[in-house]
Amino acid sequence: MHFETTKDGFTIAIGNRIILSHSPDKPAFFAGFGEERMDMYRGNFDIEDYVIERTALRHAEVSGDSVTLSSAPGQAPRLRLTLDGNAIRLTALDETINRLWLRVVAETDEHVWGGGEQMSYFDMRGRRFPLWTSEPGVGRDKTTEITFKSDVSGKAGGDYYNTNYPQPTWLSSRKYALHVETSAYSVFDFRNGDFHEIEIWAVPEKIEFFAGDSFADIVSALSLHFGRQPELPDWVYNGAIIGLKDGVNSFARLEKIRAAGTKVSGLWCEDWVGLRQTSFGARLFWDWQANDTRYPHLRQKIAELADQGIRFLGYVNPYLCVDGPLFPVAESAGYFATDVDGKTALVDFGEFDCGVVDFTNPAAADWFAEEIIGKNMLDFGLSGWMADFGEYLPIDIKLSNGVDAKLMHNAWPTLWAEVNAKGVESRGKTGEALFFMRAGFTGVQAHCPLIWGGDQSVDFSRHDGLVTVICGALSSGLMGNAYHHSDIGGYTSLFGNVRTAELIMRWTEMAAFTPVMRTHEGNRPRDNLQIDQDETVLAHFARMTAIYVALAPYLKSLSAEAAKTGLPVQRPLFLHYENEPQTYAVQDCYLYGADMLVAPVWKAGETQRSLYLPGHGEWVHLWSGKRHAGGRDITVETPLGEPAVFYRADSSHHRLFEQLRTIG
């Protein structure tokens, strides 16, 4: 990082790129204070800010590696910047400051990606993105009926920026990355052509910069900084993880699915803990131990599945329901977060209340990791689980570490991931047991081995359907999350919105070219088509699992590459074709490693797919073998069972890819 004083200010550059430019006429820093209103209803937040002061810190005094900022000469200094390697450390010199704004130099044709896992817009330029972990919303588009109904019935419609996994990090087409080290509510605003504005509801510890000669170099550096995941477990490559929550009937249904030729790696039964019925649908009983009524002799069943090479997976989240046996155990030990009166804080999760296990209390975190993850899950025979939630930390509770819950809210998903990882490590199962999360924040990369895209609607909608999963994979992948996957067929079914056979098949086609194939019955299984209820759907699903398994050698090579370099399995086109700006905003197709390009069909009724093939070499259409020159737009036929997939003609894996055509 290069710091240079100017006539009346300073500039900061990294890799010959000016990132910050400060002068009295165009200040880069603003400070002040505000009063926020934050209301949470079942994980959905209504947030407003009343800004009382926003003052430009126009005057800079430079002394060695530090800069002191004030509003004008002779005024009291309010902020100190200290240069530290490729970071700027910030110190508030005025205790009243609880709002900071920073303007980063921008170019008009610049593209910006990141922000954690973004589901609607991969290229964030031109929009404003609040960064606060929450439910992402149902519909996520204020122009749609489902979003409107979700807002009216449960304040749950959401918007384009809502995400389970925000992160104050971006990658710029100027070949640098920026990270704000804070857990406070923050906003990335990319609406101005001359600058990017960062808003933070605290003075952050530091702002870090990363630069490289290529996008891949920067992504690799980010992954090293935040932490890398181990390679995928070998058992995953055996086929799909079948999600069923049908009690003991799940085993018979699995046999039917396998009899159709489906390649299966695991049976995932969320309801291993039992069910409760709510107006939303069938919900789980949030007490994390095997339910003998729902699954009698489950330990024996798990052993029988293991003999057939099939793993068993379950479900857990960081809360305990008040009517379960684990709740009084945790409460008597003082493991729950408390309210203002010092009593256990209860959170409404939709017609039932839960306590929040306080992971800032080391004893509580250790108890959860050992007693629940260790004994109740791993020792019982589970090989993996959905580690759900993490976004619901109320902002008015009291925590063991004494830190304001508003500052711990964003940090909670990473603490949750750490508890899971600690339990896995305690049994020597790191890289063998596979848990997956939807919630995330800075540092989750070091603990969570697999991201899943959260709760999509069971449809083809632009902001909450199949296509959003691609955007989520690409954005989170740039942040150092190598592995991403989704619920095949989506999850959320409300207001008469139900799955079609076409949706399941198109989602399956995409999933076959992702790190993990996993089905989900959804929130209302009885209202929605399942893979074993339609012969055509099941036959299609079985074939796509065979393709996934046949691709395993290639996927293993990508997993090894991810562990070594941090590059994600699913990559934006520009990662390998950075000199082709037309790839910068592409978010509905992806590179599967460097050698494959996947363009899923994401609109209902479509049997053709138009896409851009990058580069100067030739691409081979996977199903027909026809060659296409790179560097141009093409349209191909995409009947069911043949998504638009291409591979590089000069790939060292070309023989493996050619064999996929023979799978009937």
Curated annotation (Swiss-Prot):
Q: Quote the record's binding site residues for 3-(6-sulfo-alpha-D-quinovosyl)glycerol.
A: 135, 270, 283-284, 286, 438, 520
Is the keyword Lyase in the record? no
Induction section of the entry: Induced during growth on sulfoquinovose.
Q: Which InterPro entries match?
A: Gal_mutarotase_sf_dom, Glyco_hydro_31_C, Glyco_hydro_31_TIM, Glyco_hydro_b, Glycoside_hydrolase_SF, Sulfoquinovosidase_GH31, YihQ_TIM-like
**Disulfide bridge positions per record:** none
Q: What Pfam families does this protein's entry cite?
A: Glyco_hydro_31_2nd, Glyco_hydro_31_3rd
Q: What class of enzyme is it?
A: hydrolase
- Please give the family membership noted in the entry: Belongs to the glycosyl hydrolase 31 family.
The name this protein carries in UniProt is: Sulfoquinovosidase
Species the sequence originates in: Agrobacterium fabrum (strain C58 / ATCC 33970) (Agrobacterium tumefaciens (strain C58))
